[in-house]
Structure formats: C-alpha cells, structure tokens
Amino acid sequence: MCKAGFAGDDAPCTVFPSIVGRPRHTGVMVGMCQKGSYVGDEAQSKRGILTLKYPIEHGIVTNWDDMEKIWHHTFYNELRVAPEEHPVLLTEAPLNPKANREKMTQIMFETFNTPAMYVAIQAVLSLYASGRTTGIVMDSGDGVSHTVPIYEGYALPHAILRLDLAGRDLTDYLMKILTERGYSFTTTAEREIVRDIKEKLAYVALDFEAEMQTATSSALEKSYELPDGQVITIGNERFRCPEALFQPSFLGMESAGIHETTYNSIMKCDVDIRKDLYGNVVLSGGTTMFPGIADRMNKELTALAPSTMKIKIIAPPERKYSVWIGSILASLSTFQQMWISKEEYDESGPSIVHRKCF
C-alpha cells in the first residue's frame, strides 16, 4: 500500500495499492481510451485485462520505472500537487540498500524537480508517532516484517532483523486452510476476499493449544458473507492464521517468530539500553492489527526476558498508519534544517542522502 498526504494531517489523504498494471493485449478495449499503464485502485479494478506488477518487494523497491509511475500518480492524480512546489518526505525500509536511497533522491530531484526532500526509516517514524525516541519497533506490513531497535532517535543497524513473513503470507495461509474446509479460493480476486476475511475475523490466541481445545465446540465459529451472497463458516482458522507470526513453521519456514525476533534484536544491543527497549516495544503496521496480538507478545517476551525485566508492549489504535503519522516530523520547525535542498543535491549529487538522512 502507498500512503500519501500532507505533513501534520491526522491521517493520509490517500491510500492505494502499490501496483502498476499494463494491458495484456493491446487494442482489446476498443472505444475506451487505452492507457499504457494503470496505477493503484484503477489497476486493481481492471486486473482482468492487465498484467499486474508490484515494484516493491519485501519493502524494497526493485522496479524503478514502475515506482516512478506510482509517484507520478501520487503527485498528479491523488494529491493533485505540483511536486516542484513542495518538499517531499519519503520513507524507506530498514536496511534499504545505499544505492536505493540514492536512486530515490535522484528521481525526486531530477524527474520531479522537488525543492527539497528527506528519506526517513519507517520504523523510526512509527516510534516518533508513539511519542518516543527510544524503543524497539516491531513493524509488520504486507511484504516484510522488521524489528528495529532505536536509541535517542537513531536506528541501530547492527541489531535490525528482517523477517520475510507478513500480511501477504498470512492471506496465502488462510487461503490454504480454508481450502481444507472445502472452500476454494484461487484467483487474485478471491485472494482479496480472503484478505478481507482475515482483516475482519482473525485474532491471536493467548494460548494456542488451549484455544484449539475450545474451538472443538462451535463457540468460536463466525460466518462471513461472500460477495455472491453465499455464507461461509470459519472456526479455528480465525486464530490459526495469525499464529504463523509466532510459529513460522506453520508456513514451512524455519525462521524465528516475531516474539523471538524481537528478543534477538534486543540481545544484539548494548546491555545498558536493553531495559529501555523491553519497556518500549512498539507495534506498527497493518499486520499487527490482529486483536490479542499485544497480550500474546507480552506473554512470549516475558517468557524469554530476564525474570525481573519490566516489559511493556505499546499498540496504538492507529498503528496501521503510524509510519505515516510519524511524518508529522516534517512539519516541525526543528526539522526544516534537515531537508536536503535542491542546491545541496546539485552540488554533491545523490550521495548527499547518506550524510543528511540516517
């Protein structure tokens, strides 16, 4: 998802899927104005006749031509602003390759002629949005999850861990376990339905085994009405789906769960700051929106941490957009000296981004 808007607003004024679609066959849509490419919701709605591409994989931009199309669409169609009139704050994934930051900087100044820009790490903005400058952020979106320890506003790169398990994988897993119940979801359109089921009905169990016992009765069953009016029933799938965050083996992955990854991240930090990290575990991103996730995280971290350690999980209700809300940073008076200006860029080239944004 691409989230855009104006610094200081309460929420992004536009949120659309970061996809670019191109017609599979030219000349099929006779009489319609045939565009070479479609972005976001329009690509999503016309997906039957398009080939869809995701320029962002696991949080990192891999296709710059398509990314440029997404930014163009954001400025001109969504926000309806001239990019040369506004400074731009972009966000990047933790551990984003250096070449990528330079490429983002170059496109903003050379293609869009922005007067100034800044690149901020997503997790750092989430932490700012929660009103903190020290803590560990567990950020989980659609394509990737990260645990990012931050001390006094600086991310600690040696302790950042990445987990390629996020919302998309959970949707796929839910598709799989619903198939075992006899419901078949296969196409991309049906995948969107399953994503909706996941967002509306899934939750994290505090004790998975106990919940499985409870679920043998129909106490936990919920019904969901499909777009065609058919009603399906979903039971233990509701908590089996997000359980994969804590037990990636459900997906056939050998990695540690989000609780263990958070713990491992903290253990890579200096012993003197661990207490501050344990006491400020901030959840962010759409995949942390499951009910029950904060309590479960607390329980699992408490089991891993030293027994005297005070653990606090912060799960703000608006955490789906907390990275975006952290962009309030750009409207602070103290931030104005931090922008990379067009003059600085012209003088130093794209590598300026490493000196000014960290």
Curated annotation (Swiss-Prot):
Its EC number is 3.6.4.-. GO terms for biological process: phagocytosis. It catalyses: ATP + H2O = ADP + phosphate + H(+). InterPro entries: Actin, Actin/actin-like_CS, Actin_CS, ATPase_NBD. Keywords: ATP-binding, Cytoplasm, Cytoskeleton, Hydrolase, Nucleotide-binding. SMART domains: ACTIN. Actins are highly conserved proteins that are involved in various types of cell motility and are ubiquitously expressed in all eukaryotic cells. Multiple isoforms are involved in various cellular functions such as cytoskeleton structure, cell mobility, chromosome movement and muscle contraction. This is Putative actin-23. It comes from Dictyostelium discoideum. The gene is act23.
